[in-house]
């Protein structure tokens, strides 16, 4: 018997919707990353993108533990001298709640072309509405 190696024809992607209301950020991000990579499937291969599509709604109602709202900071640099910008988690949740979950999931994915392709399958929305009803996403229960 030969070792099975999946090909692009073997990939079967499904759509799932996750309600992020009152879920902890890091625990939710790990479950989403697991699904995006396809590690829940028996035909998982680390060199292929065989994960599912994930739609996350109500991202503005996400929770964090401890004092992270005030203490956690996100940094970016413009490339110019003195161009370091920082924003706290509390301000980022108030202005762009989708970016909080996207940043958390991005940090857990591979840092290469494959990781960027996996991240494109994640759709995050602040409110309860999403435009992916035509794909008939199944509700995904997050367990932790």
Curated annotation (Swiss-Prot):
**Cellular compartments per GO CC:** cytosolic large ribosomal subunit
Care to name a GO molecular-function term for this sequence? mRNA binding
> InterPro entries per the record?
Ribosomal_uL13, Ribosomal_uL13_bac-type, Ribosomal_uL13_CS, Ribosomal_uL13_sf
Keyword vocabulary terms for this entry: Ribonucleoprotein, Ribosomal protein
State if Nucleotide-binding is listed as a keyword.
no
Is Ribosomal protein given among the entry's keywords?
A: yes
Picking any one GO biological process from the record gives:
translation
What's one Pfam family the UniProt record gives for this protein? Answer: Ribosomal_L13
Query: What does the function comment of this entry state?
Result: This protein is one of the early assembly proteins of the 50S ribosomal subunit, although it is not seen to bind rRNA by itself. It is important during the early stages of 50S assembly.
Q: How does it assemble?
A: Part of the 50S ribosomal subunit.
Q: Which family does it belong to?
A: Belongs to the universal ribosomal protein uL13 family.
User: What is this protein's name?
Assistant: Large ribosomal subunit protein uL13
Tell me the organism. Answer: Nitratidesulfovibrio vulgaris (strain DSM 19637 / Miyazaki F) (Desulfovibrio vulgaris)
Q: From the UniProt record, report the name of the gene that encodes this protein.
A: rplM
């Amino acid at each position: 018997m030969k070792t099975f190696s999946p090909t692009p024809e073997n990939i079967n992607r499904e759509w799932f919707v996750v309600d992020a209301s009152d879920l902890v950020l890091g625990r939710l991000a790990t479950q989403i990353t697991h699904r995006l990579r396809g590690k829940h499937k028996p035909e998982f291969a680390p060199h292929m993108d065989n994960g599912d599509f994930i739609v996350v709604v109500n991202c503005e109602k996400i929770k964090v533990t401890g004092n992270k709202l005030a203490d956690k900071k996100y940094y970016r640099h413009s490339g110019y001298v003195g161009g370091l910008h920082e924003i706290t988690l509390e301000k980022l949740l108030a202005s762009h709640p989708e970016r909080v979950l996207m940043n958390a999931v991005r940090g857990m994915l591979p840092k290469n072309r494959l990781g960027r392709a996996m991240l494109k399958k994640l759709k995050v929305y602040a409110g309860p509405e999403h435009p992916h009803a035509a794909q008939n996403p199944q509700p995904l229960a997050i367990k932790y």
